[in-house]
């Protein structure tokens, strides 16, 4: 692999390469491993990486978000790999884990590289990849999606609510890295996730109105909003968006901008009163 092929795309989690078949062109376990490491690191909060390198933060794994992000990728890789192995899609367990882990890291970090055609994978593997495409990496990185920070807080809110139901008189606080999260922050996280899913649903419905099948419509909208790149169906990891109707391409372009600007940054442009 030449240095210009994919190094910058991996660091920036942008996914662009010089080959039509992406990283599958090289068919190298060594290249896959190096790129996986690069993508995984690029999905961590850059400020946290800098603080760790300069000695201001002594252990990057002390961060709850980092542990959640890396742990999620590990669990998802194991689930997908075992699913592919038991379905006899790949001849050996290590081979299945190799392709599974690369694809999981790629979609979670929203890099969009591919080493295999995930359209032929098992339904369980596809569901896990969809989950990864929604959650994605940490805030403060170059990745898109809902972000691990928000999803971790959402899970904490659900757990706290269940505990509150069991102990109505208890005073429960939600903490992140030892810091109590204010209600305003929790409300904003909930609002963002609901709004994100609402636009995802709207984009899916809009695409189906123009004859695009449901899987392609959903995955294209999801991949566009999360800036992931590849989806499933007509926009699978070994395909592209060229075959979609022009109006659907415009819709997905809008979703890309919406997701990249964290939704509310773009919505404000349409409300002149907010400019004052």
How would you describe each model-predicted region?
Residues 4-276:
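Membrane-proximal intracellular helices of multi-pass ion channels
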